[in-house]
Swiss-Prot record:
Organism: Homo sapiens (Human)
GO biological process: one example: calcium ion transmembrane transport
GO molecular function: calcium channel activity; inositol 1,4,5 trisphosphate binding; store-operated calcium channel activity
Name this polypeptide is given: Short transient receptor potential channel 7
Similarity comment text for this entry: Belongs to the transient receptor (TC 1.A.4) family. STrpC subfamily. TRPC7 sub-subfamily.
Lineage: superkingdom: Eukaryota
Pfam families per the UniProt record, alphabetical: Ank_2, Ion_trans, TRP_2
Glycosylation positions in this chain: N514
Membrane topology: Multi-pass membrane protein
Amino acid sequence: MLRNSTFKNMQRRHTTLREKGRRQAIRGPAYMFNEKGTSLTPEEERFLDSAEYGNIPVVRKMLEESKTLNFNCVDYMGQNALQLAVGNEHLEVTELLLKKENLARVGDALLLAISKGYVRIVEAILNHPAFAQGQRLTLSPLEQELRDDDFYAYDEDGTRFSHDITPIILAAHCQEYEIVHILLLKGARIERPHDYFCKCNECTEKQRKDSFSHSRSRMNAYKGLASAAYLSLSSEDPVLTALELSNELARLANIETEFKNDYRKLSMQCKDFVVGVLDLCRDTEEVEAILNGDVNFQVWSDHHRPSLSRIKLAIKYEVKKFVAHPNCQQQLLTMWYENLSGLRQQSIAVKFLAVFGVSIGLPFLAIAYWIAPCSKLGRTLRSPFMKFVAHAVSFTIFLGLLVVNASDRFEGVKTLPNETFTDYPKQIFRVKTTQFSWTEMLIMKWVLGMIWSECKEIWEEGPREYVLHLWNLLDFGMLSIFVASFTARFMAFLKATEAQLYVDQHVQDDTLHNVSLPPEVAYFTYARDKWWPSDPQIISEGLYAIAVVLSFSRIAYILPANESFGPLQISLGRTVKDIFKFMVIFIMVFVAFMIGMFNLYSYYRGAKYNPAFTTVEESFKTLFWSIFGLSEVISVVLKYDHKFIENIGYVLYGVYNVTMVVVLLNMLIAMINNSYQEIEEDADVEWKFARAKLWLSYFDEGRTLPAPFNLVPSPKSFYYLIMRIKMCLIKLCKSKAKSCENDLEMGMLNSKFKKTRYQAGMRNSENLTANNTLSKPTRYQKIMKRLIKRYVLKAQVDRENDEVNEGELKEIKQDISSLRYELLEEKSQATGELADLIQQLSEKFGKNLNKDHLRVNKGKDI
């Protein structure tokens, strides 16, 4: 017995000295954190050592037997036993400590366990009575501190993490799916921050008190909201939530520029989440669910197509990888060749023949669609591909008319500006020039058809959405200029007609050569060189030229349909944006030198070899064409011997050329090259995104016939008009019937019995509806549940497949340490039991030996 106790004491002393030696070696330089006069008793030191290294038997024995132990004592870093046990992943020690009442720092231990991903320890801590009501999980450490509560405190100096970090936010930051799920079941949620420009009392007070902490708290909240773990587990529609959140974060990146990179990273994180969910789809039904939203309300038929609401939202928010994903593109391609499934697999030659056939027979196809819009041919024409071909062919014909309208002047001007030709001697010259030709009449019909199409688009999308698309602005500008041009031309024609009417009524001669006419009438007989600069016909011709240029530039709209020209069109658009950015600096430098050179030479008008810089207009022309090397150095030379002015002019002109040509133009070239490289590096995604935008404009119902065939209403249009009138009448009748029913119900409620019966019936119907809603999840919800399950499982597998890091090695080391103490305890118990057995055996055999010895002695005596 003495030998056994001696062995135990030697073993315990050896273990304790070894532990103290290890801790002393680690802690040595850090005793500076201790306050003066504070120290631990040997019992507390041993207790903290046992908790840190997972010595379960010692911790259990000290908690059960010691009367003087302070289990909330802290070490040199201010950590108590619970924090040390959690930090080293000792679940059994943590469970033993959580059984004690008035245990401190439970909240910090929870945050520590979440940050390290210790799920079982998190579950054990959440079962603590402190989290019974759930309020601890909804309040941030700062709010707890304001309530004079150090629940989340790391030590007396503050919290381990930021004051606004709640357990659910920390779990979301760490992408701990299981912990996030546990906290969500406990009722924890991440509150979405208020709008950046919110002026409520709470936001105003936080901004006034500490603007930096307010911004950081918003950033931490958005980091939690944008985490894949929180998005996938907290939202009923994770795809929609992620898309909207990505747009909000992108908007905040432009507002809070100090956190621009952080917000952009979070926005990209949301976009990657959406792409990851789409990548896990296994069949068409799941792809449709993501692209369209709730598939229960999507009807595939001849008259209805899926809404593609998620794709429209992704295009609006520029989630390019989502739109360019193969699953999304395959679905869009299927819809693009709707009712033309055989054409999809055909060669380019066959497709070209189909396009050529549509080009030749477009008028006949339009007539057939007017007569039978619901026939097989009508359904074929309503397919997106055929609508695209029809509109492209129509616009090509329109461009051809513009070319034909100018063909009479291709060989050069047949009449000089000072010459006039008329059909008969008494005809006024302007009547002949202002008449509309047959090509111009056709152009006007096309313009009216395009205006009607744009009006329908504005009616369907709304003015705000319409303005957001740059191509719509181009169409609006082009059509507006055409209308202004034709209006000015028509006004000139009216004035000329009035003059011709005056001549027909008041002039009796056969010719107008020797006739004295009033000035307002004689003006319309003059040749072009005598027209006023503000003449309506001159204005009309200038506007018409601008409209023609815009019309041909609109060809770029259909270029994304081709894989070769699509990236070039995207690069061109990006180049235009770069030029607009460059124009800010360009205009600033240009105006500075223009005003400076004008001030220098404005006093020398007529005293220069050319009029450069003598007026603002001449200064503009000289400096602008100097960029392209079309201005001469003689522009700064004076006829007088004013060398100082000339030298200043030479210097300014030279500095201007160096600044504009050498510096700024090369900077513009570098910007354009950089934009092109960005497009080229991700050309496939950029092109597919642009092509999807083009396709989507033809997926909507309506606008089947292109201009000008859309000006003639089809029988289908009359049918839809009648149906809309019918629906309006039905709604009106229902509203009247509902008002009568409400009056009747009010009469019923006057009776107590009827009132009770009415309320009971309403309650039963509401309960039945609620039960049906709760018991039957929608088809969309089932699909999203499957996809989110796959996403979570994939995320966990990817995380497990990562290389073993230093933290995991440390966890293994702590497990081995805890196992060592358990083995030592079992060994000690086994040694004690063996010593007891040996003692019992020795006692038993000792008695038997004594009896035999007595017998032998008695025998000798006898």
